[in-house]
Amino acid sequence: MPKGKKAKGKKVAPAPAVVKKQEAKKVVNPLFEKRPKNFGIGQDIQPKRDLTRFVKWPRYIRLQRQRAILYKRLKVPPAINQFTQALDRQTATQLLKLAHKYRPETKQEKKQRLLARAEKKAAGKGDVPTKRPPVLRAGVNTVTTLVENKKAQLVVIAHDVDPIELVVFLPALCRKMGVPYCIIKGKARLGRLVHRKTCTTVAFTQVNSEDKGALAKLVEAIRTNYNDRYDEIRRHWGGNVLGPKSVARIAKLEKAKAKELATKLG
């Protein structure tokens, strides 16, 4: 190898130059002027925003919202808090399906029945008194009497009764008398069963022989969820949940305290 000559290694091929795409220049029409909006005070008309928070709602909406927030903020005693533990959807659907079979008759149905009976009597076929069919019994006073006499097989209470004092004693009474009870969502759902707008509570007294198995299954599930868990339920207080502002304020104070402590310890 001759002196002064360096050994030549293999040359790496240079990276291919990235071919830049030539962007076509946007042709700006000079007739279209830019007029940016200024949303400062007293300037342009403001854009459409969601102003739900600032709407003056009707009184009944305000009250129900305030009630919901109070139930979260204040400490709710167990007797009232138990009404938040409603029956699960699947069991509730089965229960309502069964209850639908035992709806009481409407005014029109009663009128037609009595009319048919009167026509029979007028035709001289004799008036045979019919046996009363098993139906749901509704209303606080009726259900309370049935529970006290141990005639109710199952009691269904609405979770949103207002005022709650109307039914607050019922779970304790049912447990004392050994009657299975459950809390279901919606007084309107119970109301539909008995042809009213709303209903506080309904009770099963008797069912037909073909539905006894279905009722027994429901009673077993309900007893496990409510009657047997009564001691546990009456220990649970509700509410006492702070709002986002209070949580943020407390967090800020805690942060400041921690910072101060850190500087002291150095």
From Swiss-Prot:
Q: Locate the N6-acetyllysine modifications and list their residues.
A: 34, 97, 217
A Pfam family in this protein? Answer: Ribosomal_L7Ae
Q: Which GO CC terms are listed, alphabetically?
A: cytoplasm; cytosol; cytosolic large ribosomal subunit; cytosolic ribosome; focal adhesion; membrane; nucleolus; nucleus
Q: Where is the protein found, in the record's own terms?
A: Cytoplasm
Keyword terms, alphabetized: Acetylation, Chromosomal rearrangement, Cytoplasm, Isopeptide bond, Ribonucleoprotein, Ribosomal protein, Ubl conjugation
Q: Which PROSITE patterns match?
A: RIBOSOMAL_L7AE (PS01082)
Q: Name one GO biological process term.
A: maturation of LSU-rRNA
Q: Give the source's domain of life in one word.
A: Eukaryota
Glycyl lysine isopeptide (Lys-Gly) (interchain with G-Cter in SUMO2) crosslink site(s): 11, 20-21, 48, 97, 125, 245
Q: Which GO terms describe its molecular function?
A: cadherin binding; RNA binding; structural constituent of ribosome
Under InterPro entries, the record lists: eL8/uL1-like, Ribosomal_eL30-like_sf, Ribosomal_eL8-like_CS, Ribosomal_eL8/eL30/eS12/Gad45, Ribosomal_eL8/Nhp2, Ribosomal_eL8_euk
The condition associated with this protein in its record is: Chromosomal recombination involving RPL7A activates the receptor kinase domain of the TRK oncogene.
Q: Which PANTHER family match?
A: RIBOSOMAL PROTEIN L7AE FAMILY MEMBER (PTHR23105)
Described by its record, this protein's role is as follows: Component of the large ribosomal subunit. The ribosome is a large ribonucleoprotein complex responsible for the synthesis of proteins in the cell.
What quaternary arrangement does the UniProt entry report? Answer: Component of the large ribosomal subunit. Interacts with CRY1. Interacts with DICER1, AGO2, TARBP2, MOV10 and EIF6; they form a large RNA-induced silencing complex (RISC).
Homology family: Belongs to the eukaryotic ribosomal protein eL8 family.
Query: What name has this protein been given in UniProt?
Result: Large ribosomal subunit protein eL8
Name its species.
Homo sapiens (Human)
Q: Which gene encodes it?
A: RPL7A
